[in-house]
């Protein structure tokens, strides 16, 4: 009995490139079957390219692994630009066999995808540390130094202690081998994982501040200077989580 096109499409979802059944379907003259095969082949190419890109984002870590450094921590921060809320940093040590292909710079991902990947990273990572510096401290030491403090705090939370650090556009005062990478969150899976942990952690915190301080839209803008946020400042004033040294807040105090 000839299999239905609908059933073949269903089977293709779980078919590997080496499956002998593919040879049988390739002989099927029905247009629907051939179109389904073309779609499957296109998806396989995309998956292969995705895996290749993912593996290339372990190139820097792999260089360290080959030198005997097993515990490599990726470090990244989020929240330098907002007018309100803390700067949050994360440090993540991934295992050599980490296989979550979608991990990349958090800015390239939807909020839903970041939440999904956050859970997978939490599950699979060897260790995760999160550092946080509040707005009042940012005002005292400046945002650049605050980001460094948050990153250092995140690294110091890691257990086991990392043997080397891969850091996105920053150097830390830590006695560990470290590599400074421009756009590191798109070049290293470890930094990409850290960027996701930091971003989701901060977004969830800002959502809670949206409930505590209504009228600014923190749950939507994460403290950035959107129209709603700026109008809230004009109507209500500033909150304890606003950064008083950031324009336009400093201009109205």
UniProtKB/Swiss-Prot annotation:
Pfam short name (any one): RNase_HII
InterPro entries linked: RNase_HII (IPR022898), RNase_HII/HIII (IPR001352), RNase_HII/HIII_dom (IPR024567), RNaseH-like_sf (IPR012337), RNaseH_sf (IPR036397)
Positions of a divalent metal cation binding: 76-77, 168
Keyword Membrane: no
Cofactor notes: Manganese or magnesium. Binds 1 divalent metal ion per monomer in the absence of substrate. May bind a second metal ion after substrate binding.
Subcellular locations according to the entry: Cytoplasm
Residue intervals of the RNase H type-2 domain: 70-253
GO CC annotations on file: cytoplasm; ribonuclease H2 complex
Superkingdom of source: Bacteria
Predominant location category: cytoplasm
Cofactor: Mn(2+); Mg(2+)
Keywords: Cytoplasm, Endonuclease, Hydrolase, Manganese, Metal-binding, Nuclease
Catalytic activity of the protein: Endonucleolytic cleavage to 5'-phosphomonoester
HAMAP family listed in its UniProt record: RNase_HII_B
Purpose: Endonuclease that specifically degrades the RNA of RNA-DNA hybrids.
Family indicated by similarity: Belongs to the RNase HII family.
Protein name stated in the entry: Ribonuclease HII
Source species of the chain: Leuconostoc mesenteroides subsp. mesenteroides (strain ATCC 8293 / DSM 20343 / BCRC 11652 / CCM 1803 / JCM 6124 / NCDO 523 / NBRC 100496 / NCIMB 8023 / NCTC 12954 / NRRL B-1118 / 37Y)
């Amino acid at each position: 009995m000839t299999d239905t096109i609908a059933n073949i499409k269903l089977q293709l979802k779980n078919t590997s490139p080496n499956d002998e059944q593919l040879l049988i379907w390739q002989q099927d003259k029905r247009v629907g079957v051939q179109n389904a095969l073309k779609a499957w082949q296109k998806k396989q190419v995309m998956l292969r390219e995705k895996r290749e890109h993912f593996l290339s984002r372990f190139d820097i870590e792999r260089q360290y692994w080959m030198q005997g450094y097993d515990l490599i921590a990726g470090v990244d921060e989020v929240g330098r630009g907002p007018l309100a809320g803390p700067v949050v940093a994360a440090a993540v040590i991934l295992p050599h066999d980490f296989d979550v292909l979608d991990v990349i710079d958090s800015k390239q991902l939807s909020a839903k995808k970041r939440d999904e990947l956050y859970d997978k990273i939490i599950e699979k990572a060897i260790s995760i540390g999160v550092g946080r510096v509040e707005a009042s401290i940012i005002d005292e030491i400046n945002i650049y130094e605050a980001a460094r403090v948050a990153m250092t705090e995140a690294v110091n939370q890691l257990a086991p202690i990392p043997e080397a650090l891969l850091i996105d556009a920053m150097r830390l005062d830590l006695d560990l081998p470290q590599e400074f990478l421009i756009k590191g969150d798109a070049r290293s899976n470890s930094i990409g994982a850290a960027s996701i942990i930091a971003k989701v952690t901060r977004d969830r915190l800002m959502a809670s501040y949206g409930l505590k301080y209504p009228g600014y839209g923190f749950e939507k803008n994460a403290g950035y200077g959107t129209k709603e946020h700026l109008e809230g400042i004009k109507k209500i004033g500033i909150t304890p989580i606003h950064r008083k040294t950031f324009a336009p807040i400093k201009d109205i105090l």
